[in-house]
Protein backbone atom coordinates (compact mmCIF):
# COMPACT_ATOMS: atom_id res chain seq x y z
CA UNK A 1 0.00 0.00 0.00
CA UNK A 2 2.97 2.34 0.45
CA UNK A 3 3.45 2.38 -3.30
CA UNK A 4 0.00 3.96 -3.68
CA UNK A 5 1.41 7.25 -2.39
CA UNK A 6 4.63 7.02 -4.41
CA UNK A 7 3.37 8.72 -7.52
CA UNK A 8 6.90 9.11 -8.90
CA UNK A 9 7.00 5.35 -9.60
CA UNK A 10 4.51 5.87 -12.44
CA UNK A 11 5.76 8.14 -15.24
CA UNK A 12 4.14 9.33 -18.46
CA UNK A 13 6.01 9.98 -21.70
CA UNK A 14 5.78 13.48 -23.19
CA UNK A 15 6.35 13.59 -26.95
CA UNK A 16 7.73 17.12 -27.22
CA UNK A 17 10.89 18.67 -28.56
CA UNK A 18 12.70 16.32 -26.23
CA UNK A 19 11.17 13.13 -24.84
CA UNK A 20 10.54 13.58 -21.13
CA UNK A 21 9.32 10.99 -18.64
CA UNK A 22 7.74 12.49 -15.54
CA UNK A 23 4.93 11.80 -13.04
CA UNK A 24 1.49 13.04 -14.02
CA UNK A 25 1.51 15.56 -11.16
CA UNK A 26 4.46 17.37 -12.78
CA UNK A 27 2.91 17.63 -16.25
CA UNK A 28 0.45 19.95 -17.95
CA UNK A 29 -2.21 19.24 -20.56
CA UNK A 30 -2.90 21.59 -23.45
CA UNK A 31 -6.62 21.42 -24.29
CA UNK A 32 -6.06 23.00 -27.70
CA UNK A 33 -3.27 20.64 -28.82
CA UNK A 34 -4.68 17.71 -26.77
CA UNK A 35 -1.15 16.74 -25.75
CA UNK A 36 0.86 16.48 -22.56
CA UNK A 37 3.38 19.21 -21.87
CA UNK A 38 6.38 19.23 -19.53
CA UNK A 39 8.34 22.20 -18.20
CA UNK A 40 10.75 21.79 -21.12
CA UNK A 41 7.94 22.06 -23.69
CA UNK A 42 6.51 25.39 -22.51
CA UNK A 43 7.53 29.04 -22.57
CA UNK A 44 8.11 30.70 -19.21
CA UNK A 45 6.89 34.28 -18.79
CA UNK A 46 7.55 36.42 -15.71
CA UNK A 47 4.34 38.06 -14.47
CA UNK A 48 5.55 39.88 -11.36
CA UNK A 49 8.41 40.15 -8.90
CA UNK A 50 7.78 40.11 -5.16
CA UNK A 51 9.64 39.78 -1.89
CA UNK A 52 8.87 36.53 -0.02
CA UNK A 53 9.24 38.29 3.34
CA UNK A 54 7.30 41.56 3.08
CA UNK A 55 5.27 40.47 0.00
CA UNK A 56 5.92 43.75 -1.78
CA UNK A 57 5.54 43.42 -5.55
CA UNK A 58 7.27 45.59 -8.11
CA UNK A 59 7.45 45.84 -11.92
CA UNK A 60 10.26 44.24 -13.87
CA UNK A 61 12.05 47.53 -14.56
CA UNK A 62 12.22 48.41 -10.87
CA UNK A 63 13.32 44.88 -9.97
CA UNK A 64 16.12 45.06 -12.53
CA UNK A 65 17.22 48.42 -11.14
CA UNK A 66 17.38 46.96 -7.63
CA UNK A 67 19.28 43.89 -8.89
CA UNK A 68 16.31 41.62 -8.07
CA UNK A 69 16.59 42.27 -4.36
CA UNK A 70 14.27 43.77 -1.76
CA UNK A 71 15.33 47.11 -0.31
CA UNK A 72 13.85 46.51 3.16
CA UNK A 73 14.42 42.81 3.94
CA UNK A 74 17.75 41.13 4.69
CA UNK A 75 19.10 37.60 4.88
CA UNK A 76 21.33 36.42 7.69
CA UNK A 77 24.89 35.98 6.35
CA UNK A 78 25.47 33.08 8.72
CA UNK A 79 22.47 30.78 8.26
CA UNK A 80 20.62 32.55 5.38
CA UNK A 81 17.36 32.97 7.30
CA UNK A 82 15.40 36.21 7.26
CA UNK A 83 16.65 38.84 9.70
CA UNK A 84 14.22 40.61 11.99
CA UNK A 85 14.46 44.14 13.38
CA UNK A 86 14.90 44.36 17.14
CA UNK A 87 14.29 47.46 19.27
CA UNK A 88 16.28 48.39 22.34
CA UNK A 89 16.71 51.42 24.58
CA UNK A 90 20.03 53.19 24.88
CA UNK A 91 21.02 56.18 26.97
CA UNK A 92 22.15 59.31 25.12
CA UNK A 93 23.37 62.68 26.34
CA UNK A 94 21.18 65.72 25.94
CA UNK A 95 22.64 68.30 23.54
CA UNK A 96 21.73 71.16 25.90
CA UNK A 97 23.06 69.54 29.07
CA UNK A 98 25.74 66.85 28.51
CA UNK A 99 25.59 65.90 32.17
CA UNK A 100 22.06 64.57 31.76
CA UNK A 101 21.09 61.48 29.80
CA UNK A 102 17.85 60.30 28.29
CA UNK A 103 16.61 56.96 26.98
CA UNK A 104 16.26 56.63 23.22
CA UNK A 105 15.06 53.77 21.04
CA UNK A 106 17.55 52.10 18.73
CA UNK A 107 17.03 49.37 16.17
CA UNK A 108 19.36 46.61 14.99
CA UNK A 109 19.13 43.45 12.89
CA UNK A 110 19.10 40.04 14.57
CA UNK A 111 18.68 36.42 13.50
CA UNK A 112 16.44 34.21 15.59
CA UNK A 113 18.20 30.99 14.55
CA UNK A 114 21.97 31.49 14.80
CA UNK A 115 21.80 34.58 17.08
CA UNK A 116 23.77 36.72 14.64
CA UNK A 117 23.26 40.48 15.06
CA UNK A 118 24.36 43.52 13.11
CA UNK A 119 26.32 44.61 16.17
CA UNK A 120 28.67 41.64 15.70
CA UNK A 121 30.23 43.30 12.65
CA UNK A 122 30.18 46.83 14.04
CA UNK A 123 27.11 48.14 12.20
CA UNK A 124 25.68 51.20 13.94
CA UNK A 125 22.15 51.07 15.32
CA UNK A 126 19.46 53.05 13.54
CA UNK A 127 16.87 55.42 14.93
CA UNK A 128 14.19 54.19 12.50
CA UNK A 129 12.91 50.64 12.11
CA UNK A 130 13.07 50.36 8.31
CA UNK A 131 15.79 51.28 5.84
CA UNK A 132 18.97 53.21 6.21
CA UNK A 133 21.32 50.27 6.71
CA UNK A 134 24.73 50.99 5.28
CA UNK A 135 26.34 48.41 3.03
CA UNK A 136 30.05 47.90 2.44
CA UNK A 137 31.26 49.23 -0.88
CA UNK A 138 33.06 46.97 -3.28
CA UNK A 139 36.41 48.53 -4.27
CA UNK A 140 35.97 47.19 -7.82
CA UNK A 141 32.52 48.73 -8.40
CA UNK A 142 33.73 51.62 -10.55
CA UNK A 143 35.86 49.32 -12.68
CA UNK A 144 32.95 46.92 -13.25
CA UNK A 145 30.56 49.75 -14.16
CA UNK A 146 33.11 51.12 -16.63
CA UNK A 147 33.47 47.71 -18.27
CA UNK A 148 29.69 47.27 -18.49
CA UNK A 149 29.26 50.67 -20.19
CA UNK A 150 32.09 49.91 -22.62
CA UNK A 151 30.68 46.55 -23.70
CA UNK A 152 27.15 47.96 -23.97
CA UNK A 153 28.44 50.60 -26.37
CA UNK A 154 30.41 47.97 -28.28
CA UNK A 155 27.31 45.76 -28.61
CA UNK A 156 25.30 48.73 -29.88
CA UNK A 157 27.94 49.48 -32.51
CA UNK A 158 27.90 45.89 -33.74
CA UNK A 159 24.10 45.97 -33.95
CA UNK A 160 24.19 49.12 -36.10
CA UNK A 161 26.75 47.53 -38.42
CA UNK A 162 24.59 44.42 -38.81
CA UNK A 163 21.53 46.52 -39.64
CA UNK A 164 23.52 48.53 -42.20
CA UNK A 165 24.71 45.35 -43.94
CA UNK A 166 21.19 43.91 -44.06
CA UNK A 167 19.67 47.02 -45.63
CA UNK A 168 22.58 47.41 -48.07
CA UNK A 169 21.52 44.16 -49.73
CA UNK A 170 18.14 45.60 -50.66
CA UNK A 171 18.62 46.92 -54.17
CA UNK A 172 16.21 48.49 -56.59
CA UNK A 173 16.22 46.11 -59.56
CA UNK A 174 14.32 48.54 -61.82
CA UNK A 175 16.71 50.80 -63.81
CA UNK A 176 16.43 54.50 -63.04
CA UNK A 177 16.15 55.43 -66.74
CA UNK A 178 13.20 53.07 -67.17
CA UNK A 179 11.56 54.56 -64.10
CA UNK A 180 11.97 58.16 -65.26
CA UNK A 181 10.84 57.35 -68.81
CA UNK A 182 7.44 56.07 -67.74
CA UNK A 183 7.00 58.44 -64.82
CA UNK A 184 7.54 55.87 -62.12
CA UNK A 185 10.24 57.81 -60.31
CA UNK A 186 7.83 59.75 -58.13
CA UNK A 187 5.95 56.61 -57.18
CA UNK A 188 9.11 54.80 -56.18
CA UNK A 189 10.17 57.75 -54.06
CA UNK A 190 7.25 57.35 -51.68
CA UNK A 191 8.32 56.93 -48.07
CA UNK A 192 8.66 53.31 -47.11
CA UNK A 193 8.52 51.66 -43.74
CA UNK A 194 12.00 51.47 -42.26
CA UNK A 195 15.19 53.35 -42.94
CA UNK A 196 16.68 53.66 -46.43
CA UNK A 197 20.29 53.10 -47.38
CA UNK A 198 20.98 56.82 -47.72
CA UNK A 199 19.79 57.49 -44.21
CA UNK A 200 21.96 54.69 -42.87
CA UNK A 201 25.07 56.30 -44.31
CA UNK A 202 25.31 58.67 -41.39
CA UNK A 203 23.68 56.38 -38.84
CA UNK A 204 25.15 56.80 -35.37
CA UNK A 205 24.49 55.32 -31.99
CA UNK A 206 22.25 58.19 -30.97
CA UNK A 207 20.72 60.32 -33.69
CA UNK A 208 21.17 64.02 -33.06
CA UNK A 209 23.53 63.46 -30.14
CA UNK A 210 27.27 63.23 -30.01
CA UNK A 211 28.11 60.19 -27.97
CA UNK A 212 31.64 60.05 -26.68
CA UNK A 213 33.47 56.83 -27.16
CA UNK A 214 34.19 55.14 -23.87
CA UNK A 215 37.77 54.10 -23.40
CA UNK A 216 38.92 51.65 -20.79
CA UNK A 217 42.34 50.94 -19.46
CA UNK A 218 43.46 47.36 -20.06
CA UNK A 219 44.15 45.26 -17.02
CA UNK A 220 47.79 44.98 -16.10
CA UNK A 221 49.43 41.97 -14.57
CA UNK A 222 51.20 42.47 -11.27
CA UNK A 223 54.78 41.31 -11.10
CA UNK A 224 55.03 41.15 -7.34
CA UNK A 225 52.44 39.39 -5.22
CA UNK A 226 51.87 40.43 -1.64
CA UNK A 227 53.53 37.80 0.57
CA UNK A 228 51.69 35.90 3.26
CA UNK A 229 52.13 36.91 6.89
CA UNK A 230 54.93 35.18 8.77
CA UNK A 231 52.56 33.57 11.28
CA UNK A 232 50.14 32.31 8.59
CA UNK A 233 51.22 28.67 9.00
CA UNK A 234 51.96 28.73 12.73
CA UNK A 235 49.10 30.61 14.39
CA UNK A 236 46.21 28.44 15.69
CA UNK A 237 42.99 28.48 13.68
CA UNK A 238 39.65 29.11 15.38
CA UNK A 239 37.10 27.36 13.17
CA UNK A 240 34.21 29.32 14.66
CA UNK A 241 35.69 32.51 13.22
CA UNK A 242 36.29 31.08 9.73
CA UNK A 243 33.48 31.34 7.18
CA UNK A 244 32.21 28.32 5.31
CA UNK A 245 32.38 27.87 1.55
CA UNK A 246 28.63 28.50 1.21
CA UNK A 247 28.87 31.76 3.15
CA UNK A 248 31.66 32.97 0.86
CA UNK A 249 29.84 32.04 -2.33
CA UNK A 250 26.71 33.88 -1.20
CA UNK A 251 28.78 37.08 -1.20
CA UNK A 252 30.93 36.73 -4.33
CA UNK A 253 31.80 40.43 -4.44
CA UNK A 254 33.54 40.25 -1.03
CA UNK A 255 34.08 36.53 -0.26
CA UNK A 256 34.66 37.12 3.47
CA UNK A 257 37.24 34.94 5.19
CA UNK A 258 36.40 35.76 8.80
CA UNK A 259 33.02 35.79 10.50
CA UNK A 260 33.61 39.42 11.47
CA UNK A 261 33.38 40.33 7.77
CA UNK A 262 29.88 38.89 7.26
CA UNK A 263 27.39 41.61 6.38
CA UNK A 264 23.64 41.13 5.80
CA UNK A 265 22.51 40.78 2.20
CA UNK A 266 19.29 42.10 0.69
CA UNK A 267 16.73 39.36 0.21
CA UNK A 268 16.32 37.92 -3.28
CA UNK A 269 13.02 38.53 -5.03
CA UNK A 270 10.79 35.70 -6.20
CA UNK A 271 8.64 35.68 -9.30
CA UNK A 272 5.19 34.60 -10.36
CA UNK A 273 5.40 33.09 -13.82
CA UNK A 274 3.00 31.99 -16.51
CA UNK A 275 3.47 28.91 -18.67
CA UNK A 276 2.51 28.99 -22.34
CA UNK A 277 2.35 26.16 -24.86
CA UNK A 278 5.00 26.65 -27.54
CA UNK A 279 2.91 24.99 -30.23
CA UNK A 280 -0.39 26.89 -29.97
CA UNK A 281 0.77 29.72 -27.63
CA UNK A 282 -2.16 29.26 -25.24
CA UNK A 283 -1.66 29.67 -21.51
CA UNK A 284 -1.30 26.50 -19.47
CA UNK A 285 -0.78 28.21 -16.13
CA UNK A 286 -1.37 31.80 -15.05
CA UNK A 287 -1.33 32.81 -11.38
CA UNK A 288 -3.02 35.73 -9.68
CA UNK A 289 -1.03 38.95 -9.68
CA UNK A 290 -1.36 39.53 -5.94
CA UNK A 291 1.58 37.93 -4.05
CA UNK A 292 -0.66 36.96 -1.12
CA UNK A 293 -2.97 34.93 -3.37
CA UNK A 294 -2.23 31.27 -4.11
CA UNK A 295 -5.02 30.93 -6.67
CA UNK A 296 -4.58 30.57 -10.41
CA UNK A 297 -6.53 32.20 -13.21
CA UNK A 298 -5.57 29.29 -15.50
CA UNK A 299 -4.18 25.99 -14.26
CA UNK A 300 -4.27 23.14 -16.76
CA UNK A 301 -2.44 20.45 -14.82
CA UNK A 302 -2.54 16.97 -16.32
CA UNK A 303 -4.05 15.31 -13.23
CA UNK A 304 -7.30 17.19 -13.93
CA UNK A 305 -7.68 15.77 -17.47
CA UNK A 306 -5.75 12.48 -17.86
CA UNK A 307 -6.66 9.23 -16.03
CA UNK A 308 -4.08 8.58 -13.33
CA UNK A 309 -2.42 5.18 -12.90
CA UNK A 310 -1.02 4.18 -9.51
CA UNK A 311 0.50 1.02 -8.07
CA UNK A 312 -1.52 -0.37 -5.18
CA UNK A 313 0.20 -3.67 -4.34
CA UNK A 314 3.30 -5.44 -5.65
CA UNK A 315 3.91 -9.17 -5.04
CA UNK A 316 7.31 -10.84 -4.80
CA UNK A 317 8.81 -10.61 -8.28
CA UNK A 318 11.07 -13.44 -9.48
CA UNK A 319 12.87 -14.10 -12.74
CA UNK A 320 10.64 -15.68 -15.44
CA UNK A 321 7.75 -16.18 -13.00
CA UNK A 322 4.39 -14.58 -13.67
CA UNK A 323 3.07 -12.31 -10.91
CA UNK A 324 -0.15 -10.34 -10.51
CA UNK A 325 0.12 -6.60 -9.80
CA UNK A 326 -2.81 -4.50 -8.60
CA UNK A 327 -3.17 -1.04 -10.15
CA UNK A 328 -5.68 1.75 -9.60
CA UNK A 329 -7.16 3.98 -12.30
CA UNK A 330 -8.67 7.33 -11.32
CA UNK A 331 -10.97 9.37 -13.54
CA UNK A 332 -10.42 13.12 -12.93
CA UNK A 333 -13.29 14.41 -15.10
CA UNK A 334 -17.02 14.46 -14.35
CA UNK A 335 -18.14 12.34 -17.30
CA UNK A 336 -17.66 8.63 -18.03
CA UNK A 337 -14.25 7.74 -19.41
CA UNK A 338 -13.48 4.66 -21.48
CA UNK A 339 -9.96 3.29 -21.07
CA UNK A 340 -8.20 0.53 -23.01
CA UNK A 341 -4.78 -0.78 -22.01
CA UNK A 342 -2.55 -1.97 -24.85
CA UNK A 343 0.78 -3.78 -24.85
CA UNK A 344 3.72 -2.11 -26.57
CA UNK A 345 4.50 -3.47 -30.00
CA UNK A 346 7.86 -4.94 -30.90
CA UNK A 347 10.26 -2.32 -32.17
CA UNK A 348 8.40 0.53 -30.47
CA UNK A 349 10.97 3.36 -30.10
CA UNK A 350 9.31 4.48 -26.85
CA UNK A 351 9.60 1.03 -25.27
CA UNK A 352 13.28 1.26 -24.29
CA UNK A 353 13.13 0.86 -20.51
CA UNK A 354 10.95 -2.24 -20.27
CA UNK A 355 12.54 -5.20 -18.45
CA UNK A 356 9.46 -7.41 -18.08
CA UNK A 357 6.62 -8.82 -20.14
CA UNK A 358 3.18 -7.54 -19.26
CA UNK A 359 -0.32 -8.88 -19.94
CA UNK A 360 -3.00 -6.20 -19.68
CA UNK A 361 -6.81 -6.63 -19.57
CA UNK A 362 -8.16 -7.20 -23.08
CA UNK A 363 -11.52 -5.55 -22.38
CA UNK A 364 -12.39 -1.89 -22.35
CA UNK A 365 -12.60 -0.34 -18.87
CA UNK A 366 -15.30 2.16 -17.97
CA UNK A 367 -14.52 4.70 -15.24
CA UNK A 368 -17.32 6.54 -13.48
CA UNK A 369 -17.29 10.32 -13.45
CA UNK A 370 -15.84 12.28 -10.56
CA UNK A 371 -18.48 13.31 -8.03
CA UNK A 372 -17.22 14.77 -4.76
CA UNK A 373 -20.62 14.51 -3.06
CA UNK A 374 -21.20 10.86 -4.00
CA UNK A 375 -17.76 9.86 -2.72
CA UNK A 376 -18.84 10.47 0.88
CA UNK A 377 -22.41 9.26 0.45
CA UNK A 378 -22.50 5.70 1.80
CA UNK A 379 -26.19 5.25 0.96
CA UNK A 380 -25.70 6.01 -2.73
CA UNK A 381 -26.47 3.08 -5.00
CA UNK A 382 -23.42 1.94 -6.97
CA UNK A 383 -23.67 1.79 -10.73
CA UNK A 384 -23.75 -1.64 -12.33
CA UNK A 385 -20.86 -1.90 -14.80
CA UNK A 386 -20.95 -5.73 -14.99
CA UNK A 387 -17.28 -6.04 -14.08
CA UNK A 388 -15.25 -9.19 -14.63
CA UNK A 389 -13.79 -10.27 -11.23
CA UNK A 390 -10.69 -11.66 -12.97
CA UNK A 391 -9.90 -8.15 -14.23
CA UNK A 392 -11.56 -5.72 -11.80
CA UNK A 393 -10.49 -6.03 -8.15
CA UNK A 394 -12.72 -3.28 -6.76
CA UNK A 395 -14.62 -0.19 -7.80
CA UNK A 396 -15.40 2.89 -5.72
CA UNK A 397 -16.68 6.20 -7.06
CA UNK A 398 -14.34 7.28 -9.87
CA UNK A 399 -11.61 4.76 -8.96
CA UNK A 400 -11.21 1.20 -10.14
CA UNK A 401 -8.65 -1.47 -9.27
CA UNK A 402 -7.38 -3.74 -12.06
CA UNK A 403 -5.01 -6.70 -12.30
CA UNK A 404 -2.09 -6.95 -14.72
CA UNK A 405 0.29 -9.89 -15.07
CA UNK A 406 4.04 -9.25 -15.07
CA UNK A 407 6.86 -11.65 -15.99
CA UNK A 408 10.41 -10.32 -15.40
CA UNK A 409 12.77 -10.99 -18.31
CA UNK A 410 16.08 -10.12 -16.60
CA UNK A 411 17.81 -11.93 -13.77
CA UNK A 412 18.76 -8.82 -11.80
CA UNK A 413 18.02 -5.12 -11.56
CA UNK A 414 14.84 -3.10 -11.33
CA UNK A 415 11.62 -4.33 -12.91
CA UNK A 416 10.07 -1.78 -15.28
CA UNK A 417 6.82 -2.31 -17.17
CA UNK A 418 5.60 -0.25 -20.14
CA UNK A 419 2.19 -0.18 -21.81
CA UNK A 420 -0.12 2.14 -23.73
CA UNK A 421 -3.27 3.66 -22.25
CA UNK A 422 -5.92 4.71 -24.76
CA UNK A 423 -8.78 6.83 -23.40
CA UNK A 424 -11.45 9.18 -24.67
CA UNK A 425 -11.46 12.87 -23.86
CA UNK A 426 -14.19 15.47 -24.30
CA UNK A 427 -12.54 18.70 -25.33
CA UNK A 428 -14.36 21.49 -23.50
CA UNK A 429 -12.08 24.24 -24.83
CA UNK A 430 -13.63 27.07 -26.80
CA UNK A 431 -13.88 26.05 -30.47
CA UNK A 432 -12.24 28.17 -33.14
CA UNK A 433 -15.32 28.14 -35.38
CA UNK A 434 -18.90 28.60 -34.11
CA UNK A 435 -20.80 25.41 -33.37
CA UNK A 436 -23.55 24.70 -35.84
CA UNK A 437 -26.90 23.29 -34.84
CA UNK A 438 -26.15 19.93 -36.40
CA UNK A 439 -22.81 19.59 -34.58
CA UNK A 440 -22.54 18.20 -31.11
CA UNK A 441 -21.65 20.49 -28.24
CA UNK A 442 -18.48 18.64 -27.24
CA UNK A 443 -16.08 16.77 -29.48
CA UNK A 444 -14.86 13.37 -28.24
CA UNK A 445 -11.30 12.52 -29.19
CA UNK A 446 -9.17 9.50 -28.38
CA UNK A 447 -5.75 9.97 -26.80
CA UNK A 448 -2.96 7.47 -26.22
CA UNK A 449 -0.49 7.79 -23.37
CA UNK A 450 2.73 5.84 -22.85
CA UNK A 451 2.95 4.73 -19.20
CA UNK A 452 5.94 3.22 -17.39
CA UNK A 453 5.76 1.52 -13.98
CA UNK A 454 8.74 0.98 -11.68
CA UNK A 455 7.90 -2.17 -9.69
CA UNK A 456 11.11 -2.42 -7.68
CA UNK A 457 13.93 -4.99 -7.53
CA UNK A 458 13.78 -8.72 -8.16
CA UNK A 459 13.89 -11.23 -5.34
CA UNK A 460 16.51 -14.01 -5.49
From Swiss-Prot:
Residues 152-172 form a coiled coil. Its main location: cytoplasm. This is Dynactin subunit 4. Pfam families: Dynactin_p62. Part of the dynactin complex that activates the molecular motor dynein for ultra-processive transport along microtubules. Keywords: Acetylation, Coiled coil, Cytoplasm, Cytoskeleton, Isopeptide bond, Phosphoprotein, Ubl conjugation. Subunit of dynactin, a multiprotein complex part of a tripartite complex with dynein and a adapter, such as BICDL1, BICD2 or HOOK3. The dynactin complex is built around ACTR1A/ACTB filament and consists of an actin-related filament composed of a shoulder domain, a pointed end and a barbed end. Its length is defined by its flexible shoulder domain. The soulder is composed of 2 DCTN1 subunits, 4 DCTN2 and 2 DCTN3. The 4 DCNT2 (via N-terminus) bind the ACTR1A filament and act as molecular rulers to determine the length. The pointed end is important for binding dynein-dynactin cargo adapters. One of its GO terms (cellular component) is cell cortex. Belongs to the dynactin subunit 4 family. InterPro entries: DCTN4 (IPR008603). The modification N-acetylalanine is found at residue 2. The keyword Repressor does not apply. The keyword Ubl conjugation applies. The modification Phosphothreonine is found at residue 407. It is found in: Cytoplasm, Cytoskeleton; Cytoplasm, Cytoskeleton, Microtubule organizing center, Centrosome; Cytoplasm, Cytoskeleton, Stress fiber; Cytoplasm, Cell cortex. It comes from the Eukaryota. There is a cross-link at residue 215 (Glycyl lysine isopeptide (Lys-Gly) (interchain with G-Cter in SUMO2)). The modification Phosphoserine is found at residue 196.
Amino acid sequence: MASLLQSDRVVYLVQGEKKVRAPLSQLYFCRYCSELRSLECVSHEVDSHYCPSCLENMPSAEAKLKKNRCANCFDCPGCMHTLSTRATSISTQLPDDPAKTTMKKAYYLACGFCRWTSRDVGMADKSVASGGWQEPENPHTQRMNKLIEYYQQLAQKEKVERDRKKLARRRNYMPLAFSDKYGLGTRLQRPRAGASISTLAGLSLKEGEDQKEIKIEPAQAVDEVEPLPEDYYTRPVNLTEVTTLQQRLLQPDFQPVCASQLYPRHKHLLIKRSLRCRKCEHNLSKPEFNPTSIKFKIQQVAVNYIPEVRIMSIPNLRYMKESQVLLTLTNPVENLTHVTLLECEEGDPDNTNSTAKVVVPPKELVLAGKDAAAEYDELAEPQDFQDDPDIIAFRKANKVGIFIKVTPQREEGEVTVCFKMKHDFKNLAAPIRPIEESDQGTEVIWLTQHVELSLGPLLP
